[in-house]
Amino acid sequence: MHVTPRATMRLQFNAGFTFDDAAALVGYMHRLGISHVYASPILAARAGSTHGYDVVDPTRISDEIGGRAGLERLVAALRRHEMGLILDIVPNHMAVGGDETPWWADVLAKGEASRHARVFDIDWRHPDPERDGKVHAPFLGEDYDRALASGTLRLCRDAAGRVWALAHDRRFPIRDEDLPAIFGEGAPDAAEADRLLDRQHYRLAWWRTAADEVNWRRFFDIGELAGVRVEDPEVFEATHGLIFELYAAGLIDGLRIDHIDGLADPGGYCRRLRARLEDLRDRRPAAAADHAPLILVEKILAPGERLPEDWPVEGTTGYDFMAELGGLLHDPSGRMPLRSLWREITGEPDDPEIEVEAARRQILATAFEADLARTVRAFAALARSRRRDRDLTTAALRRVLTEVVIQVPVYRIYDTGDGHDAADDATIAGAIDRARAHVVPGDRPALDRLADWLHGGRAIEDGGSDAAPEAGRTDEADPDMLRRAALIRFQQLTAPLAAKAVEDTVFYRQAPLLSCNEVGSEPGAPTLSPAAFHKACIDRRRHHPMGLLATATHDHKRGPDTRMRLAVLSEMVEEWSRTVKAWRRMNMPSQVSLDGHMAPHPADELMLYQTLIGVWPAGLDATRAARNTAAGEILPRVAGWWQKALREGKRRSNWVEPDTGYEAACLAFLQAIMGSDSSFPEALDRLVRRITPAAMVNTLAQTVLQLTCPGIPDIYRGSEVLDLSLVDPDNRRPVDHARLAGLLAAETEPAAALDSPRDHDAAKQAVIARILALRAGDPALFLTGDYLPLTVTGPAADHLLAFARVSTATAGAQPPHAIILVSRLADRLIPEGGAPLIPAEGWADTLIDIPGPLAGHHHEVLTGERLALREGGLAVSGLLTRLPVVVMTGV
């Protein structure tokens, strides 16, 4: 079956949305223009999992979502419509705890002797002899002694006669050799149970000990997701066997790799994965998609960072594109005034670099102490492997490692001991230089040696008296092997630290404008000019033309249209400043006195107002009843978001020890200002009405760019209409697919749907359907076609982005092409009460330069109009007359 990747739709599978539910939507997705379903993880996960990333058995497909038979039914439906399937897989980690994960349970029962011990990234050696050879098991809900005394932790026998340690709803296996001693004279008391548990291959402990004591790599700081050693060939095959079987059987056509930066050797993993899939292509049935296997990696790229050239992948999952879109559609003139407003209202620093460093320091100390200790031990072992470095103390190495890890500005470098590229070398050099300012003079030799190891200098240089192996050394003490192990530990620490410090902390602390705080974006990153956006697109077309282009994901902080609405505030900072200050005065009586302070804190209050702007429904009837209904509908969503935001920020509450008093005060404030007798909802509705036209311009600009820039557009389920969602779980709410199918069947004219905000869902969906139909008619134009920036001049040039996609497959006077125009930063050019469109007088004498080969007659895809384009300067005002975007093809 021939199917060209044109557009994906991400579906979230769980017990409430199964393979059969997805199969019922295939016809709708096909009509919309989707070529591939992009499925969340489908392997057996924890009972009731809502996302599938907590895999318990990689050898089975989840029965909760339909099992193998359900998958086959879905694929059959896809094949009937000539569509493919991309599968999200989780090589980095598995769910752990009790016996729900068979491989983990076997490790707990047998320790290092388990045949599955090599699967998990466990550090079996411990300085404390009593813990050496044991798995730290931080799965108790309370202190170990209290759990034993209360009976929360106890021994029990199941119906089959097997004895377990039972804690809450989890069972932990008892060594076979200990079974005869149990229940011999009746049930053991707490002291006897303690002695028995002390003999096990694991050490049960309170969950709070994980950050300090855990001796296995976690996914971020989650104590129930254990790192998997896919760098081991046997583990790779064991964890991927079913995936390869599904690919060979033609049931899947590509893979999305979750958290690639967690792996020991991401590049090596990608090469091994590519080789295995390519080897299986000849075994695939004729009915399967005939394109090469797609491999897409979840990788957060810092500004200016690129995927390594030697990774054989199609590209990323699209967070980098999201960041570029955000940069393009925010007004650069609003950046510094918004920061000043934040500082004025909150009294907090507005420098993102200060906040990021503080967050990194806090997270490293409170969430990754055990991971830092493992990394320190790895470098200390490297130091001990040679006489020259044996006097580098563990304490000194810890101090300098702490400072360097904090200063690494990207998720990680890529070095497994064989060296790294110039970009990574510059990253390390910068981190070392910045760390030097925090290191005391006595630690500088340790910092210099660490710099040498990280820069790629051999652990033992050629020649010299100490270059020869010392007597009694084993292969395990080989300096190059030790350096490799230390480098891997270092890289597996910087990646989760970056994620937790920025995405899960700073984004909830510092928010001059919340639409900028999105996964893939950098705090305080500058906006993107049209020229810089063009450069990014040209670069993507050259290096990764089949990477995904995302605007929404299951992990986003805010939906694409939430962000586009808030982005308008960057264009009207003075008005926003007056408005938010008036809101604060209006709502001051609803604040709660708490321990001598008023709640909410101004920073939390400012974030709340932005969130309410983002989710408030547009197009309401101008009545109190309509506003009260809307307030009641969004209140639970916003309350859930706010509690999560307060805890993620780790300032006035947190996940470990929530300040329930402060949280309750904030909730009371929210309920008061959104109450039926409050005047605030009317003020909120007034502002949302005010910014809706410019917000819709942003929405259509973002949508058109996603569908026409180099790459494969990925549409997160439900975001084909306006997506005003918040962070999970809000962005994973069920979608009304029947409504969406009805909207599509109505075949709405996009321009006709602009007048009323109530029709904006239909307008966005119609734009998507029409452009995807264009892509279906000429897939190569958008996959391999050149990206040609078009010059715009005149008074409103900054408000237009223009480019062409030009076919490289056909030569001629007028090659197949599409010309794309999108309005941007439209707020100040739209008259009060106007439609989502910059009027002709707003464009004035702005011109777009049409190259000779692209001149001639054109068909406008979104309106059906026929346009004649002459070579040279062409008035923009005559092109953007019905919509704020144009997509036209030569005829």
Where are these regions (language model features)?
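Hydrophobic or amphipathic alpha-helical targeting/insertion segments
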Residues: 74-123
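DnaQ-like (DEDDh/DEDDy) 3′-5′ exonuclease domain used for proofreading
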Residues: 122-209
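Short helix/strand-capping turn motifs
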Residues: 105-108, 295, 406
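Alpha-helical transmembrane segments and their helix-helix packing motifs
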Residues: 96, 342-347, 376-377
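Carbohydrate-interacting/catalytic domains
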Residues: 1-47, 55, 59, 64, ...
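ATP-hydrolysis module of ASCE/P-loop NTPase motor domains
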Residues: 142-146, 155, 163, 348-381
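Conserved short loop/turn motifs at secondary-structure junctions
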Residues: 92, 257-263, 756
